[in-house]
């Protein structure tokens, strides 16, 4: 009798994706982040579901419903903080995952890469709308500032913003629709993640050497299931340390003040994981220019496969490109720091230089360096 996991229509899909999947024998811990993102997504959907049972999406009661969750609901505080800090862990894993893709040339799987970019945008939209829901000062003003950026679009901008708001300012209609979208988008993300995996399994995984590994594949289970469990335990340990010891470390104190349209906070800033893009937005004095730079800071990932000029896939054997990659990482950390600083000297100049460097590395320096490295190989 054939094994049921290989014949049953549903079990067969799971078997071919997580059990008998032929996997390169040399993939490192950098390949753990895909499964960690899956765990983050499941965790966010579950905690979010329980929060939605007690949350009310009305401007008069939203803030107090969060207070009610934290004070009166059994273990409501831990669910709330797991959800808030779970988002931070989600983005840490996301950026690591994208960084791995850039470093090891995984972007040459263009379908998988492009679905990944769509996933990134969808998750960013979900996180932004989730941040608006507690209806604190930073929620309200963050929503006002970011949605207002769309008014920079010529001709239709103002109408578009008012259409999104459902009125002439961020109000009850905005909060209600943001809650609706915040609830539905994680399921869209789940579907996109399945498509992401579907495309990946068409080609098989990349590996650190960048060399085809068809001659040396091992089954996913038990080797990588054990490895993924280790990664998951470390992820949950980090998350719980954050939740139980300093749950507000990554949040903004202003969000503990109920939203007040008549009082603007001194420094409006998004959550830490959007600060790099926010810094790029602020570094351009023109509104439309800033919005375009903001969009391009992520969209630039879509043209990375076109800019690949190297004869080698990954950066494992390309030391000059490695230096550039780590310069890019340092630059993104600098942008993240600048995004959280007030708009004054010297932060403005540092932000502008870091923004220029970000685009220069990706569009100019990396392709040129790859060509130089190709020529070095000939000597």
Curated annotation (Swiss-Prot):
Main location: mitochondrion
Binding site for a ubiquinone: 201
Cofactor note: Binds 2 heme b groups non-covalently.
Residues annotated as binding heme b b566: 97, 196
Membrane topology per record: Multi-pass membrane protein
Record key words, sorted: Electron transport, Heme, Iron, Membrane, Metal-binding, Mitochondrion, Mitochondrion inner membrane, Respiratory chain, Transmembrane, Transmembrane helix, Transport, Ubiquinone
Superkingdom of origin organism: Eukaryota
SUPFAM superfamilies: a domain/subunit of cytochrome bc1 complex (Ubiquinol-cytochrome c reductase), Transmembrane di-heme cytochromes
Example GO biological process: mitochondrial electron transport, ubiquinol to cytochrome c
Ligase recorded as keyword: no
GO cellular component, one term: respiratory chain complex III
Residues that, per the record, bind heme b b562: 83, 182
Cofactor: heme b
Matching InterPro entries: Cyt_b/b6_C, Cyt_b/b6_C_sf, Cyt_b/b6_N, Cytb/b6-like_sf, Cytochrome_b, Cytochrome_b_C_euk/bac, Cytochrome_b_N_euk/bac, Di-haem_cyt_TM
Function: Component of the ubiquinol-cytochrome c reductase complex (complex III or cytochrome b-c1 complex) that is part of the mitochondrial respiratory chain. The b-c1 complex mediates electron transfer from ubiquinol to cytochrome c. Contributes to the generation of a proton gradient across the mitochondrial membrane that is then used for ATP synthesis.
Additional record remark: Heme 1 (or BL or b562) is low-potential and absorbs at about 562 nm, and heme 2 (or BH or b566) is high-potential and absorbs at about 566 nm.
The protein's name in its UniProt record: Cytochrome b
Encoding gene per record: MT-CYB
